[in-house]
């Protein structure tokens, strides 16, 4: 059978602007007639012709509700637009880091390589018929489309009048591995359904010393727990942690991917990963002895949370500790780090490591594509952000399972001569040792979700206006908390990319204090309704005798300053944040 190409008339939808992580909306929005098709055609039209005609693209995601329908629609549109091959992870499941790896690494049996891919995910947002869906396009380097491309996509969505689709192309059974070939007006079109985990596992084995991690996991003194939060990480967890590294299956929690993430919010933090938090002894008291090490990943497995026994590692500390230990612990970095980078709201723990180890250091806006540019230019090896994203230049996305393996590698290295000893070096030991050398950045983030957009704008505008007179700001701060250090500089963060010279403005409001502490205020665009205000509060403590305080006590004066300075309750009516991290 030869499929035919149909031109379908359509009209633009408002608001199809892809943010730092693509287009995210409620499923019901994506189910509107032509809504997904408009965005997909606008993307094809924004790409160079050679990345569409005769090209190979990946289409898969975190398995959330509507993914299976979306794969079939995109495959039919790809065929109609002259794409030669579509690669699909079995069951439409591929983690975001795995898509990046597959675009960069996979060579199919016929020798083809991918030029890009559609990732179907709304990351850590909930899934289900009334929840969120998302789509983003990644380029040939495996990283998210840069602003030059996403701006073009958005512009196309505003003027689109028709799209191409092979309506008579039958649906492909994506649960079965194999290549299905169709014939169209321009020749053959293949849909290649392949195993979701194989390529990614192969890549991880080139980065980490699996044998040393295996020895750690085999030690009777070491216990391990991983929570997949019913996201796509489950497709990798059994393969890596159980089959390759020898962990017991009982150490895996919620590792069956589900379209609605089991009704949960697949965001690996202390609020939403409740089951893991309790098991690790950080929740309600339990008589069961917690494991030595616990970790979780989010819906599309690009975020991670690291826990020790009754101990939480902040993401800002996590990236700093990985960078400080990478060269000794991880074979991939044995010849040294090219540089390190963090997003602006992430604590300055990484800056201190970079300074001490004489590493190139970069502070970038929120959004993984900024790290990608540095990596493509060979300027950065390890990077991270406070929102539970950590990664390296092995791919161009953050990578939850990579971060877990990095921590297991550090633990394996620290315990290599100690596996038969009385006591293992623990996660907590490693963090305390790090603070002893580099000082501690007490850190918290307050999220106010679904705030009225106008109120949020007014709050941010006030904070910018106040920056014109720091003496007034300091006077106000002294009235709120007399012992807090003075603000020495304040600005709206702006970034000039050292690679391509592009400028990103309005990236968050910063108040920097004389003792190295910071307050940062940002409006976030990753939710699908309302605005989210994020307040980042960071208190630096150099004195190693004072690094063991309760975080909430150490931060209390600065929290008070942040809430009163921003007038958040007055302007938004919110007396407390939705989430505290």
UniProtKB/Swiss-Prot annotation:
Free-text cofactor note: Binds 1 Mg(2+) ion per subunit.
Coiled coil residues, start to end: none
Residue spans of biased composition, Basic and acidic residues class: 1-11
Keyword Iron: no
Subcellular location: Cytoplasm
Signal peptide boundaries: none
SUPFAM superfamilies, sorted: Phosphoglucomutase, C-terminal domain, Phosphoglucomutase, first 3 domains
GO CC, alphabetical: cytosol
Top-tier EC class: isomerase
Positions of region (Disordered): 1-20
Keywords attached to this entry: Carbohydrate metabolism, Cytoplasm, Glucose metabolism, Isomerase, Magnesium, Metal-binding, Phosphoprotein
Cofactor: Mg(2+)
Modified residue annotations for Phosphoserine: 123
Binding site for alpha-D-glucose 1,6-bisphosphate: 24, 123, 302-303, 366, 385, 387, 398
Active site per the UniProt annotation: 123 (phosphoserine intermediate)
Protein family: Belongs to the phosphohexose mutase family.
Name of this protein: Phosphoglucomutase, cytoplasmic
Organism: Bromus inermis
């Amino acid at each position: 059978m030869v499929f035919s190409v149909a031109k379908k008339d359509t009209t633009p939808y408002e608001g199809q602007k892809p943010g730092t992580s693509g287009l995210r909306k409620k499923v019901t929005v994506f189910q509107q007639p032509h809504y997904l098709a408009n965005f997909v055609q606008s993307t094809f039209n924004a790409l160079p012709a050679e990345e569409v005609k005769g090209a190979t693209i990946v289409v898969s995601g975190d398995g959330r509700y509507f993914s299976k329908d979306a794969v079939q629609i995109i495959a039919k549109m790809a065929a109609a637009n002259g794409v030669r091959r579509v690669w699909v992870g079995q069951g439409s499941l591929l983690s975001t880091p795995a898509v990046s790896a597959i675009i960069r690494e996979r060579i199919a049996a016929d020798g083809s390589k991918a030029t890009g891919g559609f990732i179907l995910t709304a990351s850590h947002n909930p899934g289900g018929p009334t929840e969120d869906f998302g789509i983003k396009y990644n380029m040939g380097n495996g990283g998210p489309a840069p602003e030059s491309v996403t701006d073009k996509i958005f512009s196309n969505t505003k003027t689109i009048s028709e799209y191409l689709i092979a309506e008579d192309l039958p649906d492909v059974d994506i649960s079965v591995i194999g290549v299905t070939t169709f014939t169209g007006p321009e020749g053959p079109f293949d849909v290649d359904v392949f195993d979701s985990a194989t390529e990614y596992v192969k890549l991880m084995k080139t980065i980490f010393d699996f044998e040393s991690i295996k020895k750690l996991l085999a030690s009777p003194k070491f216990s391990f727990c991983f929570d997949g939060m019913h996201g796509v990480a489950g497709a990798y967890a059994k393969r890596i942690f159980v089959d390759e590294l020898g962990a017991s299956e009982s150490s895996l929690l919620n590792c069956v991917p589900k379209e609605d993430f089991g009704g949960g919010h697949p965001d690996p933090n202390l609020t939403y990963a409740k089951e893991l938090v309790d098991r690790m002894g950080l929740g309600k008291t339990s008589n069961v002895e917690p494991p030595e090490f616990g970790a979780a990943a989010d819906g599309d497995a690009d975020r991670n949370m690291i826990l020790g026994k009754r101990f939480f590692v902040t993401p800002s500390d996590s990236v700093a500790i990985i960078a400080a230990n990478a060269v000794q612990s991880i074979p991939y970095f044995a010849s040294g780090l090219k540089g390190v980078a963090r997003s602006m709201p992430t604590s300055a723990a990484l800056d201190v490591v970079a300074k001490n180890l004489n590493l190139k250091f970069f502070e970038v806006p929120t959004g993984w594509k900024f790290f990608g540019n540095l990596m493509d230019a060979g300027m950065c090896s390890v990077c991270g952000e406070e929102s539970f994203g950590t990664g390296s230049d092995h791919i161009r996305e953050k990578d939850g399972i990579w971060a877990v393996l990095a921590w297991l590698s550090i633990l394996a290295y620290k315990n290599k001569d100690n596996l038969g000893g009385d006591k293992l070096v623990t996660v907590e030991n490693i963090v305390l040792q790090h603070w002893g050398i580099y000082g501690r950045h007490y850190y918290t983030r307050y999220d106010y979700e679904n705030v009225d957009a106008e109120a949020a704008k007014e709050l941010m505008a006030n904070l910018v206006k106040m920056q014109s007179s720091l003496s007034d700001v300091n006077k106000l701060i002294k009235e709120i908390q007399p012992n807090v250090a003075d603000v020495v500089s304040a600005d709206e963060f702006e970034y000039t990319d050292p690679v391509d010279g592009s400028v990103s403005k309005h990236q968050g409001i910063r108040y920097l204090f004389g003792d190295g502490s910071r307050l940062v205020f940002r409006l976030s665009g990753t939710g699908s309704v309302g605005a989210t205000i994020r307040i980042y509060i960071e208190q630096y403590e150099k004195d190693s005798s004072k690094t063991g305080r309760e975080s909430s006590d150490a931060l209390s004066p600065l929290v008070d300053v942040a809430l009163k300075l921003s007038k958040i309750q007055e302007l938004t009516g919110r007396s407390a944040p939705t989430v505290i991290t």
